[in-house]
């Protein structure tokens, strides 16, 4: 494979992971904006499942050397901070 093709695959993989992370971030934002039912078990289950799925996607991309481990950690870290904000907001409510 040419260097251009490899770079293209790497960029596409990272863009797809960022897109999936953005969808989860939006779920978190919606819950933060609508804290009508703090600690909704169903919502928490959905977020946990989405986060687990994304972590598996990231792990797979790292193992295929499509993204750097640091890039993957950064994506998860940003979402984990958002989740911490959500949990903090539900405790205050």
From Swiss-Prot:
Highest rank taxon of the organism: Bacteria
Pfam families: DUF1507
InterPro entries in UniProt: UPF0358, UPF0358_sf
Gene3D superfamilies, sorted: SO2669-like
Family label: Belongs to the UPF0358 family.
Stated name of the protein: UPF0358 protein BH2626
Organism field: Halalkalibacterium halodurans (strain ATCC BAA-125 / DSM 18197 / FERM 7344 / JCM 9153 / C-125) (Bacillus halodurans)
């Amino acid at each position: 494979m040419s260097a251009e093709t490899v770079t293209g695959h790497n960029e596409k993989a990272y863009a797809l992971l960022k897109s999936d992370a953005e969808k989860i971030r939006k779920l978190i934002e919606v819950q933060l904006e609508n804290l009508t039912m703090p600690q909704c078990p169903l919502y928490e289950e959905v977020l946990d499942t989405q986060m687990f799925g994304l972590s598996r996607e990231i792990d797979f991309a790292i193992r295929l050397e499509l993204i750097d481990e640091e890039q993957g950690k950064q994506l998860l870290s940003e979402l984990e901070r958002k989740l911490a904000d959500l949990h903090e907001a539900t405790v205050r409510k």
